[in-house]
């Protein structure tokens, strides 16, 4: 694993949604619309299929062999003035990191009598794609980036949520398996190695753990930055709408901010069928439109009430191909948001690229963000402290809650997160929990044996 240190503030939009919702098209249209407004934009895609090249109308080459670049993507290609696009090179990234790991562990291989793998034997393992995407996110924020906006075409929502949770999870594993306090004994390693007559690998192990910890912390800062948001794409319908709700709850569990819900491939209001007015095809299409509009209405209400912009993209009657179709898509996009006077019309796909239209209108990073996961002191009233965890989209039957020492393990559908308890709550016992108004409210009762007594 190799993530890049250093960093800069760069507006970053991660585009995801259920499989087949149109993530790649939405990411490309967003990036092009932003470039048309004068921004310098880099569009990265993790899709290794033909869709990105078909949508953009350009070829995305792989990185040259052995170019030594720390950025895990191929040479960025100009799509339009101000917009460059590149494909994240998952396979090449894995082989580079595997060769690096073998080089670092050469002495251990010699000790064990093992033969390192040749370059052509190194085929990527499960988990290679998330690590390549995380490395790409970090690399794009390194130094003085020559662009104003980074748009990333991410994997489907479940994979994206697990990917965004990975740095925190891996850091926790490192701290548990290789506690920093045990590193004090490293001074004894050379003496132990002489007594044993063989090299002791623990020194290198701890050095590697320290490097990984720093690199994972760096990419976690990118994910948690105020300038990084998620854009959810959905093709409205009953099944897809429920998948978006699950994704929304999973993103909230990871403290990821959603800037826009993009409802894609919307049919016209009047669905007349050419050559079959009022016939079988017209009735079938009318039913499909009604189903889509019902799902759209419910999603609009759910997201707008939480001040999330909703952007509607029309169905072009064909699969978008090239910048002409992307320009048409962006030009016909309609967005609505919650403003100071209620629901207001927006600017389509470029809403939320410079700042929030809601409470944080001063822009990303300039406004004070209230602590979302707040602890409410209700000891004087109810004898409890209440930890409020916003989880919009969560269902009561899909929640799971386990107290383990100084941690709270929260499950929302297929997603889980281990949360360290605030110091005050560590001296309490969990006395109940309830899901109210899109937030999980966990009640803690002070433990008399641990809680400080008033004099």
What are the functions of these language-model segments?
Residues 3-10:
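Phosphate-binding P-loop
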Residues 439, 446-455:
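Surface-exposed interaction regions enriched in Ser/Thr/Asp/Glu
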Residues 48-51, 90-94, 156-158, 179, ...:
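Conserved nucleotide-binding/hydrolysis micro-motifs of P-loop NTPases
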Residues 381, 402-404, 436-438:
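Structural motif
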Residues 14-88, 144, 150-171:
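Walker A/P-loop NTP-binding active-site region of P-loop NTPases
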Residues 424-438:
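Short, surface-exposed loop/turn motifs with a glycine/proline- and acidic-biased composition
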Residues 105-238, 242-246:
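Phosphate/Mg2+-binding loops and adjacent switch elements
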């Amino acid at each position: 694993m190799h993530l890049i240190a250093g960093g800069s503030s760069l507006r970053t939009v991660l585009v995801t949604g259920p499989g087949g919702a149109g993530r790649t098209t939405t990411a490309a249209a967003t990036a092009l619309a932003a470039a048309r407004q004068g921004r310098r934009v880099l569009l990265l895609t993790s899709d290794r299929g033909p869709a990105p090249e078909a949508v953009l109308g350009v070829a995305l080459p792989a990185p040259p062999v052995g170019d030594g670049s720390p950025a895990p993507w191929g040479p960025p290609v100009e799509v339009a003035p101000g917009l460059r696009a590149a494909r994240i090179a998952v396979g090449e990234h894995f082989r580079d990191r595997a060769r690096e790991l073998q080089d670092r562990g050469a002495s251990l291989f010699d000790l064990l009598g093992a033969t390192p793998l040749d370059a052509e034997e190194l085929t990527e393992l499960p988990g290679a794609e998330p690590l390549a995407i995380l490395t790409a996110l970090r690399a794009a924020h390194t130094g003085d980036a020559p662009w104003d906006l980074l748009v990333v075409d991410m994997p489907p929502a479940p994979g994206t949520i697990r990917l965004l949770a990975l740095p925190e999870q891996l850091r926790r594993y490192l701290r548990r398996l290789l506690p920093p306090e045990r590193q004090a004994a490293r001074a004894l390693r050379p003496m132990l190695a002489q007594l044993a007559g063989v090299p002791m690998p623990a020194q290198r192990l701890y050095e590697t753990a320290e490097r990984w910890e720093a690199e994972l912390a760096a990419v976690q800062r990118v994910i948690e930055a105020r300038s990084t948001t998620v854009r959810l794409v959905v093709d409205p319908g009953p099944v897809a709408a429920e998948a978006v709700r699950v994704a929304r709850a999973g993103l909230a569990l990871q403290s990821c901010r959603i800037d826009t819900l993009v409802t894609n491939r919307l049919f016209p209001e009047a669905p007349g069928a050419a050559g079959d007015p009022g016939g079988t095809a017209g009735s079938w299409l009318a039913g499909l439109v009604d189903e889509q509009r019902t799902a759209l209405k419910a999603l609009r209400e759910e997201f707008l009430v939480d001040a999330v912009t909703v952007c509607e993209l029309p169905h072009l009657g064909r699969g978008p191909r090239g910048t002409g179709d992307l320009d048409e898509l962006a030009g016909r996009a309609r967005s609505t948001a919650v403003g100071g006077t209620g629901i207001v019309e927006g600017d389509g796909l470029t809403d939320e690229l410079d700042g929030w239209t809601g409470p944080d209108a001063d822009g990303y990073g300039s406004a004070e963000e209230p602590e979302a996961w707040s602890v409410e002191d209700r000891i004087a009233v109810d004898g409890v402290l209440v930890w409020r965890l916003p989880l919009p989209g969560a269902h009561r039957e899909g929640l799971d809650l386990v107290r383990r020492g100084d941690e709270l393990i929260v499950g929302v559908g297929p997603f889980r997160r281990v949360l360290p308890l605030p110091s005050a709550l560590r001296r309490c016992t969990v006395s109940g929990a309830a899901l109210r108004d899109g937030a999980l409210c966990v009640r803690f009762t002070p433990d008399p044996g641990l809680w400080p007594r008033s004099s």
